[in-house]
Regions:
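Glycoside hydrolase catalytic-domain context in secreted enzymes
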Residues: 1-381, 389-404, 422-871
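Short beta-strand elements
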Residues: 405-422
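Extracellular/periplasmic metallocenter environments
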Residues: 386
Length: 871
């Protein structure tokens, strides 16, 4: 009989109340004011006209496996009412309810029809055919108030990308007309963006009388309360953008060929190279609507650079921040960029090197912030040398509060080119993209920049003092020496009587094949949506219990994220301990069905907290805040006995149409890496649990995500798409890494030894285990061939093991059989299989399944990507 760790009472627990209150306290800081003429915060609650698709249908977070199931979601309508507002627009909101209900009914009918016609499960169609948001009713009359709030919502999710069309990236015709009507007829008009992915703001910026735009994001199950707190000034927004908001979608260099835009979802050519986000906009002098790092607040700040110091080890900037407003407190972010010299390698205009956020400062209050980052982190990747290099020349240090407000603070002079890391190229091109070049382009500049460079503090960096690290790459592992004697157990390993390698040497090939696979039997409806656990219904899967009875090795539970812990909130088991289903496992997993309790049965409850989505958390630029959110999830993992959280997601926001951008942090790899590390440190401060950073790597497209081939240069791969993962590994040592579905340069990432072993383990020192995304090593083409003209095949189980992809999820008998057969025919060395099994069991034995478990990260000497001190 299965053991369940869920509660048997449906009452709201003290933990739920505590965590909801903490999220409400933290999340307001993440919100970003794009525009404000002083209208926000409102002086108090009162009569208000509230419109928009997000008033009653507030989006707490995106869809798919990243959606956290919660007890309740506080809508913005509810939040405003609870704060004392009288909402006058019930008639309009009722009208939109009907518009939305009709659109959703038509969508569901179309899904069912298409699934029947194509003879595929409805869940396959659901994940590929996105719901098209209907336009809103037209506003025709003014209400009896001087204040109007418009809530614009957008949703997206796993399995499909967005579109550059009305009611998606673009605003609908009626949406724009309604906002313009409010701006014309009301004294105060506030637009609240309940979105996690970008929308076009060019037409909005043309509307006269639009007083404030608040990027509220998707803040979890308390979103409505948090928005009300910010609108009334009870919570102070101090977010800064972690993406560039273009004036036109076509301004993004990836726009022409991204995903479905060019009709080809099989091959994605990364012609933008290293010029992603602000690296492109600044270097090619393209003016955005809102630049990277931008964000207003309820007050103003003055930032003054006090000093810059640098040597062969570190670059250190000391700056003072003062609140020069007279009414409201606030927080400011000091952003430090560097401009590397052009040598034999092109460089962007500037790149983020470090950042630090002030404490909450009252009017007139100041604080000194010191930001330090490793000098070697300014290196670029030289494909010809297969090395990271600091090229000779002048490195300008720039300081500001956004990418378009930086000023030159120092000039670091390096006389000789230095190789910081000597490795080897790992990602040979199969069909190399024609990359952008800045040759002949005049970059962004500003009045006085040349004078700042000439007057900047000059610091010489000792070239010879920067040592070269040479990577030693691993070879195919030999078979473990056989341990002769009694059958070893987990207790023997923990006591020191024998080593884990000794125990693994005793396992049969069949046992190791089971260890290297999850316990499910393929990716059925439950597995497809991440619901393959026997011990925590709604969790994504379990590791094997085949070694429990005779060796004392427990199985562990893995659950989805990253916006909280994804479990089924309410489930029922019969007298034999078996879960009772409604007959529709898809709806059961999304908690859509009420199930009767049979005689002798038991109800269980697993209510978890939905924290802000990653894209919103990153806008805080506050690593301690993100760590606290990780701590929230960690406590709930302990309660429900979850060992591995399948999060954080940390792919790069290469293009705003990626359907899963809400799960990821930023267009910048430093921000992404530091946020993921902070989240991981929060989780892994709890004994026996850990994270799985994902999706490794270059998972920047959802359309045809399992079979798309991403063509990327070695340099762009390393500097943009791997750098964040490298930072997270070196500064937090996540317990696991999840490989992505896609191919990179013709090789499935799940089957890439160069990615999973040479880069992650040999170059970065990753110590945990790697797992596949769900269904990676199964043939899933039958589910997607109806929509995509598939060009590439799927990854294989044998090659996963060869690559160092230790755990295949959710697991199926075919995977196990392929592994056993491959060892038998000599195409899979025994030592390689033993090594994969060893890495999995090494983590399992440190999990919370054992009473002696400790915080996983405590065993590592972790680095710091950026160090911040305040005085």
């Amino acid at each position: 009989m299965a053991t369940f760790y869920a509660s048997k009472t449906g009452e709201v627990s003290a933990r739920e109340k505590e965590h909801s209150a903490l999220v409400r306290e933290l999340a307001g800081e993440c919100m970003t004011l794009l525009e404000n003429d002083g209208t926000l915060p409102l002086a108090g609650a009162g009569k208000v006209a509230v419109y928009g698709n997000g008033v009653r249908h507030t989006v707490k977070g995106g869809t798919g496996s990243g959606d956290a199931n919660t007890r309740t979601v506080v809508t913005i309508e509810q939040g405003l009412k609870e704060a004392g507002f009288e909402i006058l627009t019930g008639k309009w909101l009722d009208e939109y309810d009907k518009v939305l209900a009709d659109a959703q009914a038509a969508y569901q009918a179309e899904l069912a029809k298409k699934a029947e016609e194509l003879h595929v499960p409805i869940f396959a169609v659901m994940f590929s055919e996105v719901f098209a948001q209907p336009d809103v009713p037209v506003i025709t009359e003014k209400e009896d108030t001087d204040t109007a709030i418009y809530v614009l919502s957008r949703n997206s999710g796993e399995g499909a990308d967005r579109y550059n069309r009305a009611c998606d990236y673009l605003l609908g015709e009626n949406e724009l007309a309604d906002i313009a009507y409010l701006a014309e007829h009301y004294e105060k008009t506030v637009l609240i963006l309940n979105i996690a992915n970008l929308v076009d703001t060019t037409e909005l910026k043309k509307i006269k009388g639009l007083n404030a735009i608040l990027l509220a994001g998707q803040a979890g199950n308390a979103t409505g309360n948090i928005v009300a707190d910010v609108v009334l000034g009870k919570s102070i927004p101090s977010g800064k953008l972690t993406d560039t908001w273009a004036a036109s979608y076509e301004d993004y260099p990836s726009s022409k060929n991204f995903s479905h835009n060019n009709g080809d979802t099989n091959d994605e050519y990364y012609s933008d190279g290293i010029y992603v986000g602000y690296r492109y906009f600044d270097t090619f002098n393209v003016t955005p609507n809102y630049c990277f790092g931008y964000g207003k607040g309820y007050t103003d700040f003055e930032t003054e650079v006090r000093d810059v110091e640098a040597d062969a080890k570190n670059v250190t900037v000391t700056a003072s921040v003062k609140n020069i407003g007279d009414t409201f407190a606030g927080k400011e972010v000091v952003q430090v960029y560097y401009s590397a010299p052009d040598g034999t390698i092109e460089k962007p205009y500037q790149e983020l090197g470090g950042f630090g956020k002030s404490d909450l400062l009252s009017p007139g209050e100041s604080q000194t912030i010191t930001i330090s980052f490793p000098t070697r982190s300014m290196a670029s990747y030289d494909e010809k040398k297969a090395a990271w290099v600091l090229e000779a020349g002048t490195y300008y240090i720039r300081v500001g509060n956004s990418s378009r407000t930086t000023k030159v603070a120092a000039a670091l002079n390096l006389k000789e080119t230095v190789v910081t890391v000597q490795g080897k190229n790992l990602f040979p091109a199969d069909d190399a993209p024609q990359e952008l070049s800045k040759a002949g382009v005049t970059p962004y500049s500003y009045e006085g920049e040349a004078e700042e460079k000439a007057a900047a503090k000059q610091i010489d960096i000792c070239s010879k003092c920067i040592k070269t690290e040479t990577v030693v790459y691993s070879e195919t592992p030999e078979a473990f020496p056989a341990y002769e004697g009694e059958k070893l157990t987990a207790a023997d390993v923990k006591s020191g009587k024998a080593t884990l390698k000794d125990l693994v040497s005793q396992l049969t090939v069949e046992e190791m094949a089971a260890v290297c696979n999850g316990t499910a039997d393929g990716l059925g409806q439950e597995g497809f949506i991440g619901s393959s656990s026997d011990m925590a219904p709604g969790a994504a899967g379990d590791t094997t219990s085949i070694l429990l009875e005779d060796r004392g090795i427990y199985n562990t539970i893995l659950a989805d994220g990253p916006a909280g812990l994804r479990l089924i909130p309410h489930f029922v088991v019969d007298a034999d301990g078996k879960m009772v289903s409604s007959g529709n496992p898809l709806e059961d997993a999304f908690n859509k069905n009420e199930i009767e309790v049979p005689e002798g049965g038991t109800e269980y409850f697993q209510y978890c907290t939905a924290i802000p989505v990653a894209a919103l958390l990153a806008q805080s630029w506050n690593m301690d805040l993100i760590r606290k959110c990780g701590d929230i999830v960690g406590k709930e993992m302990e309660e429900f006995h979850i060992s591995v959280w399948l999060a954080p997601g940390m792919n790069i926001h290469r293009n705003p149409l990626c359907g899963r951008n809400f799960e990821y942090y930023s267009e910048d790899p430093l921000v992404a890496g530091m946020c993921a590390a902070a989240d991981t440190r929060g989780i892994q401060s709890h004994a026996g649990i850990g994270t799985s950073i994902k999706h490794f790597a270059a998972n920047n497209q959802e359309d045809n995500r399992m079979y798309v081939n991403e063509h990327i240069s070695e340099r762009a791969m390393r500097e943009i798409y791997l750098k964040g993962f490298e930072i997270a590994v070196k500064t937090a040592q996540p317990m696991t890494i999840m490989s992505s579905y896609n191919l990179v340069n013709g090789v499935h990432t799940a089957n890439s030894h160069d990615l999973l072993t040479a880069a992650a383990r040999d170059e970065w020192g990753f110590a945990g285990y790697v797992m596949t995304d769900w269904g990676t090593s199964e043939d899933m083409s039958g589910l997607f061939a109806y929509k995509y003209n598939l060009k590439y095949g799927h990854s294989t189980s044998r090659e996963c093991v060869l690559a160092g992809n230790d755990l295949q999820m959710p697991g199926q008998q075919g995977n196990r059989q392929e592994i056993v057969a491959s060892v038998a025919d000599g195409t899979l060395p025994l030592g390689q299989l033993q090594t994969c099994a060893y890495r999995i069991l090494n983590v399992v034995l440190q999990s919370l399944a054992y009473d002696d478990c400790k915080p996983y990260g405590d065993q590592f000497d972790l680095e710091e990507a950026v160090t911040v001190t305040k005085a």
